[in-house]
Amino acid sequence: MASQPPQPLSGQPVTQYEEYQSEVITETTNRPTPAADIYEITPTNDVMDDRYEHEHDDYESGAMYETVRTWSPQSRPELVRIASVFSRVDSHPNVTPTTEDGGQLNRRDTLAGVKIGDPVLDPTKPEFDFYKWARMFTHVMENEGIKRNRTGVMFRNLTVLGSGSAVQYQDTFLSPFAAPFRPGELCGKGRNPEKVILHDFNGAIREGELLMVLGRPGSGCSTFLKAICGELHGLQKKKESIIHYNGVSQHTFKKELRGEAVYSAEDEHHFPHLTVGQTLEFAAAARTPSKRVLGVSRKDFSTHLARVMMSVFGLSHTYNTKVGDDYVRGVSGGERKRVSIAEIALSGAPICCWDNSTRGLDSATALEFTKALKIGSQVGGITQCLAIYQASQAIYDIFDKVIVLYEGRQIFFGPTRIAKQYFEEMGWYCPPRQTTADFLTSVTNPKERIAKEGYENRVPRTAVDFERYWKQSQNNKLLLANMDRFEAEYPPEEGHLQKLRETHGQAQAKHTTSKSPYRISVPMQVKLCTVRAYQRLWGDKSSTIATNISQIMMALIIGSLFFDTPQTTDGFFAKGSVIFFAILLNGLMSITEINGLYAQRPIVVKHVNFAFYHAYSEALAGIVADIPIKFLLALVFNIIIYFLGGLERSAAKFFIFFLFTFITILTMSAIFRTLAAATKTIPQALALAGVMILALVIYTGFALQPSYMHPWFKWILYINPIAYAYEALLVNEVHGNRYRCATPVPPYGGGKNFACAVAGAVPGEMSVSGDAWVESSYDYSYAHIWRNLGILLGFLAFFYFVYLMVSELNLSSASSAEFLVFRRGHLPKSFQGSKDEEAAAGGVMHPNDPARLPPTNTNGAAGETAPGGSTVAVIPPQKDIFTWRNVTYDITIKGEPRRLLDNISGWVRPGTLTALMGVSGAGKTTLLDALAQRTTMGVITGDMLVNGRPLDSSFQRKTGYVQQQDLHLETTTVREALRFSADLRQPKSVSRKEKYEYVEDVIKMLSMEDFSEAVVGNPGEGLNVEQRKLLTIGVELAAKPQLLLFLDEPTSGLDSQSSWSIVTFLRKLADNGQAVLSTIHQPSGILFEQFDRLLFLAKGGRTVYFGDIGKNSETLLNYFETHGAEPCGPSENPAEYMLNIVGAGPSGKSKIDWPVVWKESEESRHVQQELDQIQSETSKKNEGHGQSAEKEPGEFAMPFTSQLYCVTTRVFQQYWRTPSYIWGKFLLGLASALFIGFSFFLQNSSMAGLQNSLFSIFMLTTIFSSLVQQIMPRFVTQRDLFEVRERPSRAYSWKVFLLANIIVEIPYQILLGIIAWASLFYPTFGAHLSSERQGILLLYCVQFFIFASTFAQMIIAGLPDAETAGGIATTMFGLMVTFNGVLQKPNALPGFWRFMWRVSPITYTVGGLAATSLHNREVKCAQNELAIFDPPTGATCAQYLQKLVEAGAPGKLYNPTSTTQCQYCPLSSGDQFLGGSEIHWSDRWRNFGIGWAYIVFNIFATVALYYLIRVRKSSGRPNRIISVIMYHLSRAGTYCRAFITGRKEKCPRKREQIVQTYKEFNMLLN
């Protein structure tokens, strides 16, 4: 039915403004004087008499703050001193004058209600009272003439636009090929259409008011808050949109006073290794004003304020605890949220916008947080907006105003006390016990709202209808009139701007420009950030130490590799290699800074928005803090590599060497920092860094000499800072030195009749000048050394300047609207055209519809509000009863035992819905994990039975577990995820057709038809929070759990309506025979009544109550009231009532020990009796039915082959639908191979040309590290899903998981090998090679890339994350390429390292490729490579060299008949050249076989490491196994080294002892 335009209901008053006006004037005279913020406060005598803008406050001054008490921190002397100074204000000259009314001090004491020396002013004392402290602080500031900014905000015609449509299509590997057939998308049209996020908003918020922002997820709440603060970042306001702060335009306000309006994002971003105290003291120091009360120092002032905020938000006990994050252990999630809150409070901003800041807090903590905000508004005059999804009535009543959003449209703005009446007068029904906030949000949900009788066809239905109704209402007219008065009171850009400037200027430090939004000067910012940088380093000192140790170890390895290099011409190549290594390792050690800068970018952006500091101040501080550390590391690193690597031991040359290497470190650090600052994402930065490193390495001058560079790429040499450093170091090393000729030609010549076969040699001289050698070989000159230093310093200054500039300019990231992603050709009809959302929801609900109202008894039907409008009768009824008795869970933390669960008993019957609740830290999730058999550590005792029998291996497969984290594979669709679960978790006896039909039933049950073909995606680009939660539930239902369904916080992060939908759906499942046990977070009263039974836990995992809830919670409430609790009010939420009486919240306490009461109660004894009865009844049934038909229940539902097929198909699918990964892989191989190929394009047959050809092969292997870094994150994504959800559910085996990931990588690696082969070898070697040799090269290329993938999986298999594995893989790769025989010939390796050349897999890859490419290639020496000399008088060149030729010399004489200027080339074929590196054509197939042996080893090692480290981790034996393996491998290594090197050393272990090793290993495995 078509929607009718809404009309105001005739005959009914819309507002109560007449009586409201009389209330507000009385109320404002009694309200506490507002001030600027919670710690620096200026009073005002203004009386706000606007009848619309101020509602009556039901709280007496200070009465509502009784619960805002704090946890006492340990006293610190300086804080005690500050508190004592504050308590002795009478000694301060500015506050001691005596007046007729008793003096200012007496006024302050009377107003604050404290006496001198009162401990309520000391945040280190338990008696500290924040409200009294704030009142005292206000008047001290007034007495000293300290002003603080305060302002309201008005917005008119606010319209915000974003890019993106409601629907996007999923890209696949072939999408780029199909793009030409979609020219509209190719040109960008239709790809990112403009979307209106906020439509024409109007409103005004006076200073000191609290605004509640209500709306369902996706309605625009976050965008609205960002718009108020001016932090749209990629979104756009329409030109007509007006936002001003008491007359100051948003543009001017954000430019000059940015930190005065701040936005608190829903996510927390902090430096994880800083402590809570360091984090908050930094925030306080960054906003410390220049003029401070009582003249205290900056440090004392900021420390005191940080302590105050920690005390207010219950963080005092965490002062020395790291903040932490998902990977670093620190404070809890709730405490981290409070750190974010305290940080904003310390910013002192007069306008604060909080985006769902109560998420993750229990109801008691959320209420205390809201009351603290009220203190800031009433006492400090702070204007605050809070978006909240689940708000209790107590929280709602604290707010002054509320705005309701519906699909980006404003449908109400006004005082909180009239909002409910407005919608009721519109025609909507509010059920009893539903909170006002829930009611206001519910009217925006077609499936939840209820129309009053007689108004079904008169109420608005769509968002546009609601907006139209609002704009026609009297409330909106009064709002617009009030906005006109607001604008008249604060004319644009007039007096208020000047006041703000004056107040801001008073707070600014010296040397800060008047229009700067910052309070402290740039030098102060840099100093503050530098101190913080060192605090971060100290907090993460283990990582810093590990990094430095790895660098030092690399220096030791490289130095020892070139140890004892001969000081002859044979050492020229080694000197070039060691200097190349030194400059390269010094220069590239800073590449890890890219990840570090991206990790801190969200924090820097946040702090810049808070006006803590300039982004370039943090960047400059990072540089300053790094220089001493880099200096020390460079000093140790270069001392080792210089003296161990055989370089000249001259003080002057060493210090020049160190100078250039250190400047190179700084220059490359500046380049990598600039790269990170100039890009938007880590993949962008790393991709550019990879290409840049390849270019820097090739065009350093070592791998490819300048004279052999082609013009199309030679320009890279001139912009390569490493090239200038390499030239300087090489000429510095050889300058002024002469090197004995190692290979004179002929060796028996005398006088002028011989020459050294080295570039730069002079005929007849037995030594070669180092200067002549570098000039002839590289065209280098010692005269360039200081020129190069100047060029390096120029690079350094340039990139530092660019880095600081882009750091300041490139902070924001583009924002776009949320959208669903579908596969092409699978767009639902509902998205192909418009639809009536009300009709889609089943029409308008009626208040007396029994399907809509909450059930009136525990067995009543919960109907249409559940996600599914269809029946759930397809759920098979269950008969099994799950019981647990005296369950105890103990773990050991830091050597101390700790009990998490303490003798908990209970049961879950089929057809019942049981709630698991408790205070924060009570162990709700821990109990759920223990019952579901998902714990991996500790000791669990007690009885857990199904029908009186112990749990078998199939228990986890037969239960469903809906985890709190909605973890899904982002590339799969909803239907595919459900089918995957059904395929693997339903028994093999069920046909695939039946499984898929059941999946369709699940989709209908959960009302997922509209997005069943949608791709899961990532937040913002895929399913929203509610849809993800439904999918999580659907995945478990698709498995058809035969026993029961566990759910952990299924409503977490959802709005109240979505929570209601989820719980009522669970109600329907229970009514149809499903057994359900669910933890629930902060349920509303009507939601709580959906449950049949409650298990309530106190801290320490102790039981407070287990039993029936009863109708209207009577059974539950009677228990608490009969045992001494205060009666529950008729309108009070029973769930919140329970939390309050047991002392939940940071400051909550209870006089009654409820776990002890429960233990001694009759109800507890009844539970034990009931458990006995259940066990007795089920035992009799078991005896009557005999043994179970399933004698040996299997761990998995499907056989191994079926598992492997399903999982491999899904992994293939994931790869195919991740084109960025596949194309990134292919483009890396293609671009790198083409770049290398055309850099070494068609090298000639000179000795240098052969060396360059060998280096081209070597350079191909260097992309190994980038390939490995690409593969590992993809593996981790699959592994996280498997280990967190699918392995505990026994969906498939860990062996299947590993094999599927190995198998899927291989085809892509084969294709990548073909691409690299064609792109590299044809440009480098041409097409003249035989087809056989081209085929061998192709086989080696394919093998190399398959080896890379299996190596990556071997490394990541047992390690926790890709970052850790990446570091290890890079180190191992460095060793492999170092010892492959290219950079140091095998015969020149020290004996200790020769075995490394043999065990390096790259040795055999390079050997096979080089032998195949250069076999039988004729050598034609370049002019500077020839040994040119005159033969004795009367002899020809052939006659003179006949003796040398007869001795089997490998060279070739070019002019045998000449009698002068004999030209002798030391080599005649490529095989001779390769022989020096022990590379032989005859070994090509042996090397190929060894390569496959390494691949097989990688696969077996992958399986073994994963099993030992991750599968058996719960047994506690992996560490013992690894220890045994490592110990005996070291012994075996000694034996193998002795065998390979041919030395007569024996393995220290006898053969019998090695046999014993295998026995020990087998015992551990068994």
UniProtKB/Swiss-Prot annotation:
Main location (coarse class): membrane
GO molecular function: ABC-type transporter activity; ATP binding; ATP hydrolysis activity
Keywords: ATP-binding, Cell membrane, Glycoprotein, Membrane, Nucleotide-binding, Repeat, Transmembrane, Transmembrane helix, Transport
Job description of the protein: Pleiotropic ABC efflux transporter involved in the modulation susceptibility to fluconazole, voriconazole and miconazole, 3 azoles with similar molecular structure.
Family designation: Belongs to the ABC transporter superfamily. ABCG family. PDR (TC 3.A.1.205) subfamily.
Glycosylation (residues): N149, N157, N356, N810, N886, N903, N1244
Disulfide topology: none
Stated name of the protein: ABC multidrug transporter MDR1
Membrane topology summary: Multi-pass membrane protein
One Pfam family from the record: PDR_CDR
Positions with biased composition (Basic and acidic residues): 1178-1193
Binding site for ATP: G918, V919, S920, G921, A922, G923, K924, T925
Compartment(s) where it occurs, according to its Swiss-Prot or TrEMBL record: Cell membrane
Listed transmembrane segments: 543-563, 571-591, 603-623, 627-647, 652-672, 684-704, 789-809, 1222-1242, 1248-1268, 1296-1316, 1336-1356, 1363-1383, 1489-1509
Lineage: Eukaryota, Fungi, Dikarya, Ascomycota, Pezizomycotina
UniProt domain ABC transporter: residue ranges: 167-432, 882-1125
GO cellular component terms listed in the entry, alphabetical order: plasma membrane
